[in-house]
Structures are given as C-alpha cells and as structure tokens.
Amino acid sequence: MSTNPKPAFRRILLKLSGEALMGDEGFGIDPKVLDRMAQEVKELVELGIQVGVVIGGGNLFRGEGLAKAGMNRVVGDHMGMLATVMNGLAMRDALHRAYVNARLMSAIPLKGVCDDYNWAEAISLLKSGRVVIFAAGTGNPFCTTDSAACLRGIEIEAEVVLKGTKVDGVYSEDPMKNPDAVKYDEVTYAEILEKELKVMDLAAFTMARDHDMPILVFNMNKPGALRRVIMGEEEGTLIRAKKVI
C-alpha cells in the first residue's frame, strides 16, 4: 500500500480515554505510556498538524460505584471533571518534556493551575503550532468526555475526531467476547445507529452526526497507528455521513 505524501488532515481533535493512560497498571498513569503518547503527538506537530486533545478521567475516578452507594450524580461528575484535569496536567508535562509547546484549558476555572477555556484563544494557539489540551469535559454534569471531544472538535473546526481506544476500530460485535466479530473499515452514522454499534454515547454521537463531524476509531495502544491514521493509511474505522466509493 502506498503512503500518501501529505497528511490527510490539517487540524484534528484527539480523544483519549483515561484508561489508555493506565497501560498495564490497574489504576493511575503509566509513565511509559504517557511518554509514548506524547512522542506520537510530537510526530504530528512536526508534520504540521494542529492538535487538540481531550482526555477522559476513568483511570483516576469512576463514579458508578459511589453513585450506587448514594452519592449525588452532580458531585460525582464534578469529581470526574477534576480527574480529567489531573490527566491533562500529566499530558501537558509530558509534552513539555518532549519539547512540544502545549496549553491546558479547563472548562471550569482553576486559577493558578491551568487556563480557562476560551474558544478564540484555543484556535489562535492551534494556528501557532501549540497543542491544546481541553480538560474538565464540557464543564457540565451529565455530559461525557466523548461529548466534550465532539463539542470541542466542532468548535475548533477540526476535520475529524480521532477516538483512541483499546481496539483497532468498530466491530459488528465486541471482539473481546466474539473472536469472529467483523471489523468495519468505513461505516455511516445511520449504520451505526441501525446496527446499534458501540462507538460512544448517543448524545456525543448524534452531536457529531448533526454537525457532519467525521469520527475515526483506532487503537491508541498500537505503536504508529496515530501517524498511519493521519497519513490516510488504512487504520481503524472511519464514520461519516456517506461512504466514499
């Protein structure tokens, strides 16, 4: 397969799950995984790609158990937002150590820790070649970090939301449970809904669909996969309004 000489995308929103930062650990952040991800983002910056990043918080906080024990959902979601800020701080530090200029913006004010989210400033920073990490989700409870990724992607006019996961695309069934599950190279928004394929929560997915924001699902744990996606090689599963034949 021939490699495209130029990147397929100019500006992207990279969504990473908090769990991806755990590596083989059961909790927290694996420094080796963090540094590898920072190096992969650095490769994109060196290619001239404008990179926005949203990271989940599931490696540091999971509210389901506490919610079942009676914790208020709003309180739990606020704690989850703070977990994404912690991951964002770690990623910003890893990027700085890799000599990549990065800015951390939070949807909730955290004076002295990171900048407040500002749409116009974020776009200006991206144009100047800085990586912008968007933390604290949307700043609202009841909204997932997938929703935050789609929202920020739409706001910064990214060409695609890249969703880094533990699997290398979208399958007909859970490949962890059924080894005969079929992987899709490309699928439409309508097919995802019709076949009830698991990509992200419905609110996030319909936001992307309504604003014609393509989503590309790939395995962030696979070395080099992110670069292959950016160069337009066959990697992961592309979701958009219509298939290109």
UniProtKB/Swiss-Prot annotation:
Q: Where's it mainly located?
A: cytoplasm
Specify the pathway: Pyrimidine metabolism; CTP biosynthesis via de novo pathway; UDP from UMP (UMPK route): step 1/1
Q: Which domain of life is it from?
A: Bacteria
Residue sites binding ATP per the record: K15, L16, S17, G18, G58, R62, T165, Y171, D174
Q: Which GO terms describe its biological process?
A: 'de novo' CTP biosynthetic process; UDP biosynthetic process
**What CDD domains would the database entry show?**
AAK_UMPK-PyrH-Ec (cd04254)
The answer on whether this UniProt entry bears the keyword Kinase reads: yes
Spell out the molecular function terms from Gene Ontology: ATP binding; UMP kinase activity
Keywords (A to Z) from UniProt: Allosteric enzyme, ATP-binding, Cytoplasm, Kinase, Nucleotide-binding, Pyrimidine biosynthesis, Transferase
Protein EC? 2.7.4.22
InterPro entries listed in its UniProt record = AceGlu_kinase-like_sf (IPR036393), Asp/Glu/Uridylate_kinase (IPR001048), Uridylate_kinase (IPR011817), Uridylate_kinase_bac (IPR015963)
An example of a Pfam family matching this protein is: AA_kinase
Ranges where the record places region Involved in allosteric activation by GTP: 23-28
Q: Which reaction does it catalyse?
A: UMP + ATP = UDP + ADP
Quote the subunit structure annotation. Answer: Homohexamer.
What does this chain do? Catalyzes the reversible phosphorylation of UMP to UDP.
User: Mind telling me what this protein is named?
Assistant: Uridylate kinase
Gene label: pyrH
